[in-house]
């Protein structure tokens, strides 16, 4: 996959109110985004898998399942993409629940256009960072991926030696290769990159 850019990101919009959906879609298309819109979560879920890079903008209150349930369904399908929730009738608890699930932003209608664009920009940045990291990880050998995953879990050299049945020089070599291929200079930068 070539390096994706901001304008190649598909925005999936799930909004049951037709006038709201059309208004948001028109605005985003005018701004140059690729938008695919749906009136219900299940209609959207039927189209999985979909193109990446992508982000989702979803109303919390949908006719079939809630926006949070939609996001949980995506996670269950191993589709972890940034989501922005919108709602005209949001409670504080809904907002908290959405953010705990991993929402990038929770906007209450009516929201300012700048609020939406800022949330989209943030979500796209997160999505592109994730895709670029995945491209780098694809360049790791299977053993380097094992080392990478263990490093992210906080394992030290001795634990890597024990778990992977390798010598200290070999562990150090794998760590060095992982950091070189992921273009980081320190373990803390490796962990930061993967957040």
Residue ranges and their predicted role:
Residues 9, 17-36:
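Two-component/phosphorelay signaling modules centered on CheY-like receiver
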Residues 59, 87:
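Active-site residues of response regulator receiver
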Residues 63:
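The feature encodes the CheY-like receiver
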Residues 91, 111-120, 159, 163:
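C-terminal output helix
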Residues 40, 66-69:
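Acidic catalytic/metal-coordinating carboxylates
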Residues 179-195:
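Basic, Lys/Arg-enriched C-terminal extension of HTH/homeodomain DNA-binding domains
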Residues 68-80:
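Short amphipathic alpha-helix used as the core "switch/output" element in two-component signaling
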């Amino acid at each position: 996959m070539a390096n994706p850019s901001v304008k190649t990101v598909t925005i999936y919009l799930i909004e049951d109110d037709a006038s709201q959906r059309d208004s948001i879609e028109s605005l985003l298309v005018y701004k140059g985004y690729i938008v695919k819109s749906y009136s219900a979560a299940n209609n959207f879920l039927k189209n999985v898998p979909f193109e990446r890079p992508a982000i989702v903008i979803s109303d919390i209150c949908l006719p079939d399942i809630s926006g949070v349930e939609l996001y949980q369904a995506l996670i269950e399908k191993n589709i972890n993409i940034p989501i922005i929730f919108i709602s005209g009738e949001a409670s504080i608890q809904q907002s908290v629940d959405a953010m705990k699930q991993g929402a990038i932003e929770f906007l209450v209608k009516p929201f300012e256009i700048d609020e939406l664009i800022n949330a989209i920009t943030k979500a796209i940045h997160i999505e592109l960072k994730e895709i670029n990291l995945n491209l780098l990880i694809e360049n790791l050998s299977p053993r380097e991926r094992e080392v990478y995953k263990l490093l992210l879990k906080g394992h030290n050299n001795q634990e890597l030696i024990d778990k992977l049945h390798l010598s200290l020089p070999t562990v150090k070599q794998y760590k060095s290769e992982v950091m070189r291929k992921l273009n980081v200079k320190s373990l803390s930068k490796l962990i930061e990159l993967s957040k």
